[in-house]
Amino acid sequence: MRSDVIKKGYIRAPHRSLLRATGLKDDDFKKPFIGVCNSFAEIIPGHFFLNKFAKIIKDEIRKNGCVPFEFNCIGVDDGIAMGHDGMLYSLPSREIIANSVETMMNAHKLDALICIPNCDKIVPGMIMGALRVNVPTIFISGGPMAAGRGKNGEALDLNSTFEAVGAYEVKKINKKELHDIECAACPGAGSCSGMFTANSMNTLCEAMGIALKGNGTILAMTKNRKKLAKKAARRICEIALDDKFKIRNIINKKAVENAMVVDMAMGGSSNTILHMLAISREAGCALDIKELNEISKKTPHIAKIAPSKPEIHMQDVHNAGGINAIMNEVKDLLHLDNLTVTGETLGERIKGAKIKDEDVIHKVENAYSKVGGLAILFGNLAEQGCVIKAAGIIGSRKFSGKAICFNSQDEAIEGISGGKVKKGDVVVIRYEGPKGGPGMQEMLSPTSLIVGRGLGADVALITDGRFSGATRGLCIGHVSPEAAEGGMIGLLKDGDIIDIDVDNFSINVRLSEDEIAERKKEFKYGGKKVQSRWLRQYQKLVTNASNGAILEA
């Protein structure tokens, strides 16, 4: 056992003495030690109940002959951090989480790992840390929140509230209506109810084979969720000492490609691109961003879930057959021979899964589009690529317009709220990339204001920052190189004409090579003055979005 390093032989008497202080007895030292990585946090709706959820898992581990050791990691609620400088800390928190998992598991030489994430950066952070440790690992997330219900029975979610703010500003709704939406949108525990970043990543855990069936879709705090937790706990005990189930044997290049096929088919959050690039690097099978369009070109988009289709949420996906039904529908594009934590291949796992509601999950022959719900655009405005959630486009997939430039998210929010943005504009928000922010803020506030003000089909937005999974509209993020590295987005001027063609994967500004060269000569950027010591460290080490915004020493 890996844990013998801390518990076997006379020389480890001091170590055992410390472990006995936690309640261990003689027989416990013969059992596998299981790390239970929790992310309980009282301020996060997707996490405030995870202390009780973890207890279910630990009790089941004990019943099955192993010793659980729970430890916690931090978590940032992106919705609460949204629209102010708290969002600077969201993406950097992914690295803290990865480092924390690696530190706890390697310092204490635990034999296996069960991870309990739920929201946004916590899921990829735990995956990245687990890949560094490389022991048998299972992911069991807290589960999605149920959709809220409005006065007329319409489905609501967090994005409904953000868009309602924009509607209130232009007097489409009154203060009471705004308050009613606020009070109804998030009815209880769980990760926000649409195919936003958290639920996108939780479903991709199923596609990669590191989580059990239903991980991404069974609602939080339900009997079925608790049953899934117990099943995951039993399984980690079964595989704890089996090297075949080390996480790097599960997450390989095939698993990463499987995840991206599923992501394209269901129109997941654009943040998944950032995280899967980072995860693939940690797994030793680095995905090139250019490969993603090849996957997109062959993958039909068969499921639209909020925000792309506001009335459909994760509970509807589960009732329609879940992620297995989506995978079975696109099985010809998957590596069906890849191993999963259950011991089955992916093909064995999804065999016989049926679509139960074709309004939620379409058949391939009735796909929303023949290409995937995410796309990478290239051109003189993004030589290293940029990302769009094509599934969330409200108007045309082809757009040309005049740039209106803002040098921060705060400037953009002020400009949009002040009525500066008009139909036909391309809103440019720059110096918000991984280095420029630093921290690559999400832009849900400005995009929601645009949609809420009725401009979603008539305005495009591009940024070197990123978007919430709740964003919809013609919104292009992760522009690389970013403005802070002298990228073209930092050289744009108000009035420049920008051409966007999603179906041809292109984004360009109408400037000659000579004009671009001249602007590059004139470019000066001294960098933002960052007060935070942690964010200064992050700014120094982080790479750009085309590399997954990973840290490189």
Curated annotation (Swiss-Prot):
Q: Which cofactor does it need?
A: [2Fe-2S] cluster; Mg(2+)
Residues recorded as binding [2Fe-2S] cluster, renumbered to this chain, are 119, 192
By its UniProt entry, which SUPFAM superfamilies does this protein fall under?
IlvD/EDD N-terminal domain-like (SSF143975), LeuD/IlvD-like (SSF52016)
Locate the residues binding Mg(2+).
78, 120-121, 442
Its top-level enzyme class, in one word, is lyase
Per the record, residues carrying N6-carboxylysine are 121
GO cellular component entries: cytosol
The record's section on PROSITE patterns has: ILVD_EDD_1, ILVD_EDD_2
Give the InterPro entries listed for this entry: Dihydro-acid_dehy_C, DihydroxyA_deHydtase, DiOHA_6PGluconate_deHydtase_CS, ILV_EDD_C, ILV_EDD_N, IlvD/EDD_N
Q: Which GO terms describe its biological process?
A: isoleucine biosynthetic process; L-valine biosynthetic process
Q: Give the cofactor note text.
A: Binds 1 [2Fe-2S] cluster per subunit. This cluster acts as a Lewis acid cofactor.
Arranged from A to Z, the UniProt key words for this protein are:
2Fe-2S, Amino-acid biosynthesis, Branched-chain amino acid biosynthesis, Iron, Iron-sulfur, Lyase, Magnesium, Metal-binding
Q: Which reaction does it catalyse?
A: (2R)-2,3-dihydroxy-3-methylbutanoate = 3-methyl-2-oxobutanoate + H2O; (2R,3R)-2,3-dihydroxy-3-methylpentanoate = (S)-3-methyl-2-oxopentanoate + H2O
Give the Gene Ontology MF terms in alphabetical order: 2 iron, 2 sulfur cluster binding; dihydroxy-acid dehydratase activity; magnesium ion binding
Catalytic positions?
Answer: 468
In short, the EC number is 4.2.1.9
Please give the pathway this protein is involved in.
Amino-acid biosynthesis; L-isoleucine biosynthesis; L-isoleucine from 2-oxobutanoate: step 3/4; Amino-acid biosynthesis; L-valine biosynthesis; L-valine from pyruvate: step 3/4
Disulfide bond annotation, renumbered to this chain = none
Under the subunit heading, UniProt states:
Homodimer.
What family, per the record?
Belongs to the IlvD/Edd family.
Per the entry, what this protein does is: Functions in the biosynthesis of branched-chain amino acids. Catalyzes the dehydration of (2R,3R)-2,3-dihydroxy-3-methylpentanoate (2,3-dihydroxy-3-methylvalerate) into 2-oxo-3-methylpentanoate (2-oxo-3-methylvalerate) and of (2R)-2,3-dihydroxy-3-methylbutanoate (2,3-dihydroxyisovalerate) into 2-oxo-3-methylbutanoate (2-oxoisovalerate), the penultimate precursor to L-isoleucine and L-valine, respectively.
Q: What is this protein called?
A: Dihydroxy-acid dehydratase
